[in-house]
Swiss-Prot record:
Its main location: cytoplasm. One of its GO terms (cellular component) is cytoplasm. It comes from Bacillus pumilus (strain SAFR-032). Participates in chromosomal partition during cell division. May act via the formation of a condensin-like complex containing Smc and ScpB that pull DNA away from mid-cell into both cell halves. Belongs to the ScpA family. PANTHER family: SEGREGATION AND CONDENSATION PROTEIN A. The keyword Cell cycle applies. This is Segregation and condensation protein A. HAMAP family: ScpA.
Length: 252
């Protein structure tokens, strides 16, 4: 397998990934089910490695931290400690430090989002009104579409792609190694969107079975999203992700 050493700025760090999982799974941040969140976290890190992204060491440190917390919570208590109120009062929740960091990070992220929205409001005050997108918006609003699809949402969708390929296709006896330019895949996706002139299901882009093609397709979508050539939408947690070309939106 060829190595695509690509660092994606959209990955903001392990706390950001944990917050995404907490929101996606509708978990109480003050009572995190460590076993469940650890399993999901490790799955995302594994997917990043499948994509051969430049996974920062801090993600691996957090993985080790989660496994440590999980182990501490699974350790059997001494029988005498179960009836010793003083020991119970002194005992700390292994999750306490992590929960504190998550709460602080969420405050920081919310504040950053508020500042960003204020800046956008100021910019809009001195620009011409946007084009009328009411026709395009009707369908999206009716479905309560979420237009803020994150990179982690895309990783979750890519996990489904990998699982589906493993289930429906036998493992190849021989893998043909070939270099696939990301630019070619980006052009292929944009040409498809221009031809259809409608939104495309993210999953349908992954027609090939070779890992090289799957990885490059995912990276091509990321690059198109970063360069604002496409927009992604999702109708809710665990729902399919759809891709819309920016040209389609502007022509609506």
């Amino acid at each position: 397998m060829l190595e695509y050493q690509v660092k994606i700025d959209s990955f903001e760090g392990p706390l950001d990934l944990l917050l995404h999982l907490i929101n996606r799974l509708e978990i109480d941040i003050y009572d995190i089910p460590v076993a469940k969140i650890t399993e999901q976290y490790l799955l995302y890190v594994h997917t990043m490695r499948e994509l051969e992204l430049d996974v920062a060491s801090e993600y691996l440190v957090m993985a080790a931290t989660l496994l440590s917390i999980k182990s501490r919570m699974l350790l059997p208590k001494q029988e005498e400690e179960l009836f010793d109120e003083d020991l119970l009062e002194e005992e700390e929740d292994p999750r306490e430090e992590l929960i504190g960091k998550l709460i602080e990070y969420r405050k920081y992220k919310d504040a950053a989002q508020e500042l960003k929205e204020r800046e956008e409001e100021r910019q809009n005050a001195f620009t011409k009104p946007p084009s009328d997108l009411s026709e395009f918006a009707k369908e999206s609003e009716a479905k309560d579409t979420n237009l803020h699809v994150t990179v982690y949402d895309m990783l979750g969708a890519f996990q489904k792609v990998l699982n589906r390929k493993k289930i429906t296709k036998p493992a190849p006896s021989r893998i043909t190694r070939q270099e696939i330019p990301i630019e070619d895949k980006m052009n292929e996706i944009m040409n498809h969107l221009r031809k259809t002139k409608k939104r495309t299901n993210f999953m349908t882009l992954f027609q090939h079975d070779q890992k090289e093609h799957l990885v490059v397709t995912f990276l091509a979508v990321l690059e198109l999203m970063k360069s604002h050539q496409i927009m992604l939408e999702q109708e809710g947690n665990f729902e399919d992700i759809y891709i819309i070309g920016s040209e389609t939106i502007h022509d609506a």
